[in-house]
Amino acid sequence: MYIPDYFGQKDFDEIRRFIEEDPFAFLLFPVGDEVTTTLIPLIHEVEDGKLVVYGHMAKNNPQWKKAMDRKVTILFFGPHHYISPRWYEIRKSVPTWNYVSVRITGTLKVMERKDTEDFLIRLSTFLDAEWGKEGREKEAYYQKMVEEIVAFRVESQTVDAGWKLSQNHPMSDRKGVVENLEKAGDDDARKMAGMMRKMMEK
């Protein structure tokens, strides 16, 4: 993924925080001349200093067999928004699109049943703590869920993160972008404005 130096995000904690807040990702891998794509929620942890991502597919989804033991790419996308030159104090710039994204590559490994059970508890607790508790209390129902999925882990080989938040513009222009994003009012605009303000305060 091409990321100019001034847009690169190197703060490991920020990257982790981002993929925890936006856990829905694209899982991509080549099959012949095609690129196969799966959309799934993912959780992560750090093992020996490396980011390890965990997810699952339905057992009747044939993609997990094709991805098993192969190098895959995982893409997380956060807020993104059109940026108008009208928002700049100096209006010689071109229209552009700001965004936040993380790209992880690694080999997909299918997990054994016990690890799958542990993963499902963690995923349920992360996404819906109350429901996760109910699932553990209803053992038969919970075991049925385990039977119907294939869980996997991807230990990161590379992690690339891009925070394209107008860092290549003077502070006066960045303030103008933030003000107009806040006026836009949609969720992505508000999130992006908040991330820009946080970065500008550093």
Predicted feature locations:
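Binding-site signature for planar aromatic cofactors or substrates
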Residues: 1-202
